[in-house]
């Protein structure tokens, strides 16, 4: 059985890691390369760096940060934010990223997914979906872009199926309702999408305790759990989470 993954998420704004609640109220959480290095040594399986202001401010993700990170960490890492072309993907992969995450740009031009997958391989192309529950229509989640600012009107489940068909190798699924709240992942949303696509789904948004992380895997059917506030604030360590999940008989790579 494929090992389930724990992935610290570092939201980057102006070269610093930040954390907020429901995509707003950002506060400083440290230097991205230093934090990435710390989590790598602490036993994380992968890392995700998301330049959350890159798309909104229309500037490209800092290649320098990727290069410095690749020299410092020993685990795979994904970079997203402001990537809107094959050249942009190529630049980040050449700088040392293992995968790139496409979000707003994939909605604007879905062919970027297939072109990226054809040129660099599906394993390099992650599509990030920021989803928010539709208050008027049951069992519907809307896809948001531009750092959660704009509702596209797209149905998140249908969009997930489309990005798989276009060649995405993985989906990074963030519940905007859960983001930073520590009230638990949106299990219903995660399971709906994990059941619809045969590629890994990373659950994101809402982890507040050990049980939440277990439920993302057992109930939500996710392949990985993204963690931010819980780790940045020192409430839990990766070791504590892994030891708990191993005791719960989940297939987790132990810390050596």
UniProtKB/Swiss-Prot annotation:
InterPro entries named in the record: Aldolase_TIM (IPR013785), His_biosynth (IPR006062), HisF (IPR004651), IGPS_HisA/HisF (IPR050064), RibuloseP-bd_barrel (IPR011060)
Entry GO CC: cytoplasm
Pfam families noted in UniProt: His_biosynth
UniProt GO molecular function: imidazoleglycerol-phosphate synthase activity; lyase activity
Class of this enzyme: lyase
List of catalytic residues: 11, 130
Keywords carried by this UniProt record: Amino-acid biosynthesis, Cytoplasm, Histidine biosynthesis, Lyase
Subcellular location: Cytoplasm
Listed GO biological process terms: L-histidine biosynthetic process
Segment forming the signal sequence: none
Keyword Lyase in record: yes
Gene3D superfamilies hit by this protein: Aldolase class I
Pathway assignment: Amino-acid biosynthesis; L-histidine biosynthesis; L-histidine from 5-phospho-alpha-D-ribose 1-diphosphate: step 5/9
Enzyme Commission number: 4.3.2.10
Annotated family: Belongs to the HisA/HisF family.
Subunit structure, as described in the record: Heterodimer of HisH and HisF.
Protein name: Imidazole glycerol phosphate synthase subunit HisF
Organism: Prochlorococcus marinus (strain NATL2A)
């Amino acid at each position: 059985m494929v090992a389930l993954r724990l992935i610290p998420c570092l939201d980057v704004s102006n070269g610093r890691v930040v954390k907020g609640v429901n995509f707003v109220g950002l506060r400083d959480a440290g230097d991205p390369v230093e934090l990435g290095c710390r989590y790598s040594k602490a036993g994380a399986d992968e890392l995700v760096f998301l330049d959350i202001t890159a798309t909104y401010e229309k500037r490209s993700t800092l290649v320098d940060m990727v290069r410095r990170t690749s020299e410092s960490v020993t685990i795979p890492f994904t970079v997203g934010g402001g990537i809107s072309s094959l050249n942009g993907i190529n630049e980040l992969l050449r700088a040392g990223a293992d995968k790139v995450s496409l979000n707003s740009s994939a909605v604007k031009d879905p062919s970027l997914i297939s072109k990226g997958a054809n040129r660099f391989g599906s394993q390099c192309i992650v599509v990030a979906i920021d989803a928010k529950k539709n208050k008027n229509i049951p069992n519907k989640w809307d896809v948001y872009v531009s750092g959660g600012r704009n509702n596209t009107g797209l149905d998140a489940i249908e969009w997930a199926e489309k990005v798989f068909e276009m060649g995405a190798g993985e989906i990074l699924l963030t519940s905007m309702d859960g983001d930073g709240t520590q009230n638990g992942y949106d299990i219903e949303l995660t399971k709906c999408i994990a059941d619809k696509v045969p590629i890994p789904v990373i659950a994101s948004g809402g982890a507040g305790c050990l049980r939440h992380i277990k439920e993302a895997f057992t109930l939500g059917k996710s392949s990985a759990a993204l963690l931010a506030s819980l780790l940045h604030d020192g409430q839990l360590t990766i070791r504590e989470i892994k030891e708990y999940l191993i005791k719960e008989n989940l297939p987790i790579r132990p810390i050596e």
